[in-house]
Amino acid sequence: MARLQSPSRLITPVALLIGLGCYVFTASADATEEDISRVNRSIFIAAGLTVGDVSTVNGGIRLSAAAIAGEVHTVNGSIELGARARVDSAETVNGGIGIGEEVIVNGAVSTVNGNIAVDAGSEIERNIETINGEILLENSRIGGDLETANGDVTLLQGATVEGDIIIADQRGWWNKLFSGNSRPLKLVIDEKSSVKGRIHLYREVELHIDPAAEVGELIEHV
């Protein structure tokens, strides 16, 4: 089975933008705990700093290890949260989200077009959602629901979803008509992982759920 890239490799375009039209926030250059907003620039928050909300329109956002921020938001760009970072929420439209080890997100994590990967020891207090992308959780906890429409879902090494897993069907009629040869999505849950709520399937899904995994009721709406 092909593995989704880990957070350290998921958002490489963000790292490449450092120094190339990227706004670098450092303690020596800027006052801490202020909101940071840009339009056509990526944003890099140095390790251990505390800032307010962070937003851009066309650019990625990267928080280094142990950085703290409020709401993190971009439209066209990826988000990378380094180990032990803390944020209120993380949201993008066109871009992936990579979450390192022992990160705490007090709210939700969401993207429309992009993968989401969460490393060991991290906690997302509310929902995690993508429409066109895969979700990978490794020994991490989701306090709300997990939802995708067009991407595989993988729970490994003791990952826990406190709410429901929802695999929606948001394909248009054109895609449904001509997708006869497309492979079904995959839902993988290993023996150490758990889903406290229900699993709702609104489209064909290939299930790889270990018999030892703790999961709730499986409901097929197809």
Give a label for each model feature.
Residues 1-222:
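Intrinsically disordered, low-complexity terminal regions
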